[in-house]
């Protein structure tokens, strides 16, 4: 807990899609090798007793690496999840590099105008079943349905390709930041005041 640095995985779920359909799945509790902070236990329901006999991440790393070869890493707020997984791989002495796609960004582009784009609120807004919130399998299953809905809204993959294109400015913006807002910024030096919602 407490930011990306120092986070450890206590549970992982991977669902592999091909042409929008599930072709493989892996889920496991993970022993983080340290005490689970109380706020994480309250959020997820996962406690030290539940993970004491679970495998450590380095015991799962090769299997996860093989399962995700040639895959795009898709997650809701992908920057966080990807960096935590990548840090676990690094700690296990392995490299982990995948293309990434964020369902927060996709949803904001393809389903504009919602009050909130948190996974729970988004699922409520567009009628996606979301069981076992804050557990790996429940959140992953909900994210898969959200991603499938985004695929339906982007049949030519134009939006998805834009986000996957590393040269696109938009792929670097925070999820809440619009490219049009960036383009509208003045090009002259000076002092600027930002008010209300940054």
Regions found by a protein language model. Give the residues of each.
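Conserved non-catalytic scaffold segment of RNase H-like nuclease domains
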Residues: 1-98, 112-134
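Extended, hydrophobic interaction surfaces within ordered domains
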Residues: 47, 102, 106-167
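Hydrophobic transmembrane alpha-helix bundles
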Residues: 64-67, 92, 112-119, 136-145, ...
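GIY-YIG nuclease catalytic motif and its immediate N-terminal context
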Residues: 143-198
């Amino acid at each position: 807990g407490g930011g990306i640095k120092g986070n450890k995985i206590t549970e992982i779920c991977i669902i592999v899609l091909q042409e929008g359909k599930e072709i493989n799945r892996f889920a496991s509790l993970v022993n983080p090798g340290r005490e689970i902070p109380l706020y994480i236990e309250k959020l997820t329901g996962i406690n030290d007793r539940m993970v004491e006999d679970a495998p450590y991440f380095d015991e799962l790393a090769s299997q996860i690496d093989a399962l995700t070869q040639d895959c795009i890493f898709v997650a809701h707020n992908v920057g966080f999840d990807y960096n935590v997984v990548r840090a676990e791989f690094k700690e296990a002495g392995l490299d982990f590099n995948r293309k990434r796609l964020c369902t927060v960004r996709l949803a904001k582009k393809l389903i504009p105008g919602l009050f909130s784009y948190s996974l729970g609120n988004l699922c409520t807004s567009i009628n996606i079943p979301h069981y076992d919130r804050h557990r790996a399998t429940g959140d992953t299953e909900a994210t898969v349905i959200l991603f499938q809905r985004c695929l339906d809204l982007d049949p030519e993959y134009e939006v998805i390709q834009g986000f996957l294109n590393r040269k696109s400015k938009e792929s670097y913006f925070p999820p809440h930041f619009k490219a049009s807002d960036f383009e509208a910024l003045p090009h002259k030096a000076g002092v600027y005041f930002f008010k209300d919602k940054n």
